[in-house]
């Protein structure tokens, strides 16, 4: 870890001014990912801008019937918030599926969106990595890539996005509110994270002078038929090999509306609106779900060690859709203490 300076932002405008004045500075809230990156010399900010005292820690109802979640709401508080439990249990389930109680107590909602990949080549500064050092190469292609992406990859990067919470937010069609020197703007969640393309070092569409202030959820939370299925190597404190967030609206024996997002398979939470349209109007049967899985994975590509993830994702999609249709969501009860 290199030396750095520290300052505390007094308000959002001050935070924006400070980050705009120093392109090498970083905001810090919970620090659950940033501090790790600094210890490994992957992130080397000249200055940390403490934003923990900004008034961004509220969960509030908004005029369209949805919910606004402040960027500094801790993950643990959000998971157990009564509005989330009653109206958006998919989000609460996804949060509880991730990390550990200690990390969820510290991690902020906005920071969760900005965490970096857990690709071990990204963390190992002795190996080539286009995300860490653009133009150096991707060690995971042709290397050990069991945890890596099968969708949306490029010749530059096959890393995955690590968040569980973001997979649920993608399925719920959330919006990200940000503030920068140009003022406030709203980013559709599906547009917030990027695929690697030729610039894998850039994870999101957040501009260098912007700060996340809130995440908004629309009024529909799919509280009746949902699930967050996380498939991983061990029960506690493990990143997803594949995860599936599903929300269904079922009426008169048919799927009226479907939301489906995958984690652990791409550089961003993977949502396929063509598959959602294919599910709409269809009966909630095993055959319907198998066809949806086949469509979603039509362009999936393995890289050797992770070839198994294609079939694992196919089975995970079918199981998650089945759980949601039956109203029997995957339990995260064990994660309350593990």
Task: Show where each model-derived region lies.
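C-terminal structural segment of proteins
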Residues: 1-338
């Amino acid at each position: 870890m290199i030396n750095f300076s520290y300052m505390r932002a007094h308000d959002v405008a001050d935070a924006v001014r400070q980050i705009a004045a120093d392109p090498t500075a970083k905001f810090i809230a919970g620090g659950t990912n940033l501090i790790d990156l600094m210890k490994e010399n992957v992130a080397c900010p000249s200055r940390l801008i403490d934003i923990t005292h900004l008034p961004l820690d509220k969960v509030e109802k908004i005029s369209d019937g949805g919910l606004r979640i402040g960027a500094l709401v801790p993950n643990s508080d959000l998971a157990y918030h009564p509005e989330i439990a009653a109206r958006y249990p998919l989000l609460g389930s996804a949060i509880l599926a991730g990390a550990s109680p200690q990390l969820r107590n510290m991690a902020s909602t906005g920071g969760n969106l900005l965490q970096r990949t857990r690709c071990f080549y990204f963390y190992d500064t002795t190996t080539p990595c286009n995300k860490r050092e653009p133009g150096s190469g991707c060690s995971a292609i042709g290397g050990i890539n069991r945890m890596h992406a099968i969708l949306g990859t490029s010749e530059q990067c096959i890393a995955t996005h690590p968040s569980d919470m973001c997979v649920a937010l993608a399925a719920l069609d959330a919006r990200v509110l940000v503030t920068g020197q140009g003022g406030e703007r709203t980013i559709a969640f599906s547009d917030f994270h990027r695929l690697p393309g030729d610039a894998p070092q850039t994870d999101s569409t957040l501009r260098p002078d912007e700060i996340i202030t809130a995440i908004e959820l629309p009024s529909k939370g799919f509280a009746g038929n949902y699930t967050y299925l996380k498939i991983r190597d061990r029960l506690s404190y493990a990143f997803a090999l594949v995860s599936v967030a599903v929300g269904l609206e079922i009426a008169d024996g048919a799927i009226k509306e479907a939301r489906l997002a995958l984690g652990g398979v791409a550089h961003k939470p993977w949502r396929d609106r063509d598959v959602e349209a294919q599910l709409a109007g269809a009966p909630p049967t095993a055959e319907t779900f198998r066809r949806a899985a086949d469509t979603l994975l039509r362009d999936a590509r393995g890289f050797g060690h992770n070839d198994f993830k294609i079939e694992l994702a196919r089975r995970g999609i079918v199981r998650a859709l089945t759980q949601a249709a039956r109203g029997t969501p995957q339990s995260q009860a064990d994660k309350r203490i593990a």
